[in-house]
Amino acid sequence: VKRQSFILLFLVIVFLPGCKENGSGIGIGTVVVFPEISEPIQITDNDKEHLFASYYGINSFSKNQRYVTVLETELKDGIPTENNPATLGLVDLNTHDFIPLTKTRSWNFQQGCMAHWLATNPDSLIIYNDLRDGKFISVILNVHTRKEIKTIPYPVSGVSPNGKEAVSINFSRLRRTRDSYGYGGGGQDAKLETTFPEDDGMFLLDLETGEAKLLVSIADVKKLVPELPESGLEYFNHTLFSRDGSKIFWLARARPERNTTSLTVNRDGSNLQKCFPDGWGGSHYDWLNGDELMITAEYKGKQYGHILFTVGEKNYKRLGNGLLDFDGHGTFSPNGKWMVTDTYPKNDLREQKIYLMDMKTEAVLPLGRFPQPEEYAKKWRCDIHCRWSPKGDIIGFNSTHIGNRQCYIFKLGTLNDS
């Protein structure tokens, strides 16, 4: 697990000749200064299983970086159902104490309960999903008073940077099409009788009024995705607002083949478009800013990579000079200078690796190797799922390398130009 011989690895990577694809690359003799990075620091106890309470790339940190949102569960193996409530709490990064806040019955091992800190009060208010009275909802909670400020009659799948809007998808349909995602309990009508429903899809939520409007229906994407048999089901997952809140990215997928189409739309519902040509698909993603988007996909339908491009243009660029040609969970630092990504378990050692890339030169620094035990190889797997703190000086991630699921952080030193 410890980062061994990092200085040597750093120099080897930095002084390799660049491939110069699309004008990028690292020239011979280029010097890249990475921040000093701590050893992995475990922030949760081993008595129970823990994971960050949202999907990768979503901020889990309060604005002052004192607290992070974490789920605690006794479930180790198996798909969580409505009968497996998890405890949503905070970890105090000063003491590493776990502070329980509430229970939730809408969660999974991949995306947690989709807890977000709200920019309207980023040190006090979070929103998270739950199942109540047979319905999936979201709850706005003051973490210090434990007072519920508001309940929204829709679950959230992404929250706008301004903290005033969110998007919602059908988590019941998601559970029936990909059971390691979505929630148990039947809190929404999965509409299993319809391949492309016209009244379901991605909704835009007003978190102040609780009102929702259908932004893009599943039927709206029928002509943009591969043809399905009558028994097939198209579904939406993985939504993310751009950094300025003007656009939304998401994936349209299908059963039985799980073909994937990467899509974007403006926040007002205009300019619905595909991100890639046919055959590229899409898997993981993050916005660099309001217009540039990174998606891991099959470049030219041949090679998986971390592909950066401007929405609406075809200026596709594989990041990492060949070192990041895999499907990772890439996410950008708040200042856009760094991208951290990870790998799935590989070879007999089942090692998951974390890499940090300098966006200017595309130099890549390994941060660690984390072996995943065989018992986590199934649908309840533990992906690394990195996430940045608001100041960009902490990276949080999940790992099972000690034999159970726990939360960790790296602390990054500051650079003069950071």
Could you tell me what each predicted segment is?
Residues 58-68, 111-126, 130-131, 157-165, ...:
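Blade-terminus and WD-like Trp-Asp/Gly-His loop motifs, strongest in beta-propeller folds
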Residues 279-281, 320-330, 363-385:
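Conserved blade-ending motifs and adjacent loop-strand segments that build the rim/top face
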Residues 106-201, 215-230:
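Asp-box/WD-like beta-propeller blade repeats and closely related beta-sheet repeat scaffolds
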Residues 78-88, 134-140, 176-178, 199-203, ...:
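Structural motif
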Residues 55-57, 81-131:
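Blade-loop segments of beta-propeller domains
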Residues 303, 321-363:
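Loop/turn-rich, solvent-exposed surfaces of beta-rich toroidal or solenoidal domains
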Residues 71-85, 131, 169-200, 251-257, ...:
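Short, conserved, GDST-rich strand-edge loop motifs in beta-rich repeat architectures
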Residues 41-51, 102-109, 155, 210-232, ...:
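Surface-exposed loop and turn segments in beta-propeller and other repeat-based domains
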